[in-house]
Amino acid sequence: MRKHLLWASATLALVIAACGGSTPTSQATPTSSCANAGAAHHAYVVVQHLSGATLQKCVGFAGDTINGEALMVQSGVEYQAQTFSFGKAVCQVDNEPTTYPKCFPDNKPYWSLFFETGGAWASAANGYTTVNLHDKEALGWHYVQATDPSPAPPPLATVG
């Protein structure tokens, strides 16, 4: 009798564990976290890796605009930049590439910069430090092959 009770208790525990399962570690749909979410305006950072994986971060701000460099810093997206005679250039975003002996290595992938306004991407004419974003606009980074003469922008920001 005791063996049957132990077996029944173990079976019941397994059924309860299976039905009541733990919280999933990842979600089916990506979410966008927002720093300073209560602010009146929001701008976004959208990152697309060479693998196609994407990341989006949101930053709330009070003024009419937010500078691209302030957006990157406040978003919490990891990035590394180097200063050149023309200004700052981004060499690494969200830990890609894992190492970079040169910011612009010959025949290697690089970060292409885009600016989203009005629901459409445009290539950035200047560096990220000169971009000023308004409410619901985005800064986009796409890690692309050096052989790509006209890189595609990352996915549009999901405005929340």
Give the positions of each predicted feature.
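C-terminal motif of bacterial Sec signal peptides marking the signal peptidase cleavage site
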Residues: 14-18
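Extended effector regions of multi-domain proteins
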Residues: 10-12
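Ubiquitin-like/PB1-type beta-grasp interaction modules and other compact soluble beta-rich domains
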Residues: 2-7, 19-160
